[in-house]
Structure formats: C-alpha cells, structure tokens
Amino acid sequence: MVHFTAEEKAAVTSLWSKMNVEEAGGEALGRLLIVYPWTQRFFDSFGNLSSPSAILGNPKVKAHGKKVLTSFGDAIKNMDNLKPAFAKLSELHCDKLHVDPENFKLLGNVMVIILATHFGKEFTPEVQAAWQKLVSAVAIALAHKYH
C-alpha cells in the first residue's frame, strides 16, 4: 500500500480542485491516443481517430476522457485505499477489455504533462512528485486484477 503524507495529499487536492475535468479529460485521452497510437485499438467504436485534430475533436474521446478523469477524482478521494477503490475498473479492463496494464502508466504520464501545461509555475517539483506518486499508485491499482 502506498502512503501519502499530508503534504502530498494537499499538493494533489489543491491542484485537483482547480481542474476542469471535462476539458482536461478529453485532452489527456486525446494526447494518449496521439502520442501512443497503438492505444487506439482499444477505442475502435469511437469513430474517426485518423489524425490528431480528428482525435482531439472527437466527442467520444472527450466524453470518455471526462470519465477517465472523474475516476482520477475518485482516486484522490481514496488515496489511502486505492486497490479496493479501483477493483471493479481493474476487473473490467483486465477481463472484458483486455487492456495492456502498461497503458495505465502511459496515461499517468500523460496526466502529469496535462497538469504541467495547465498549471505552469504552480506545478512545482514537489507537486509533480506527489502527482507522480499518485498516478503510479493508480496504475498499480488498475493492474491489480492482472496479477
């Protein structure tokens, strides 16, 4: 189990409270699909993913991105208990969707980039360290069913 200090929790929740989940969610998932194009195979039903502009303008990418970031919000509420909080999502992604768990790490890295671009100077090395710890712990929790 990952332990978050009070300072790390404060760093994460402070930025998260300012996050536009709808906007950043589409941006995060869109960036994942553009930077790591092999991840597109999990989104066959999303329609046109033929170019970066098509991906970023795709309403299904935006909607699912919002859903993904909403689950990050759940992670923030359950920072001390991530594996149980993500048990159902882990099962879904493992048993039904057959998503390579490495993709969870890639999404976490994209999340950190999105935070850095949105928050600039507020995204200090200390804040980044707290977020890296969180996205890594979320990736581990999502991959839990695979082990």
UniProtKB/Swiss-Prot annotation:
GO biological process, one term: hydrogen peroxide catabolic process
Tissue: Red blood cells.
UniProt-listed Pfam families: Globin (PF00042)
Positions contributing to heme b binding: 64, 93
Domain Globin: 3-147
Cross-referenced InterPro entries: Globin, Globin-like_sf, Globin/Proto, Hemoglobin_b, Hemoglobin_oxygen_transport
Annotated function: The epsilon chain is a beta-type chain of early mammalian embryonic hemoglobin.
Family classification: Belongs to the globin family.
PANTHER family in alphabetical order: HEMOGLOBIN FAMILY MEMBER, HEMOGLOBIN SUBUNIT EPSILON
Protein name: Hemoglobin subunit epsilon
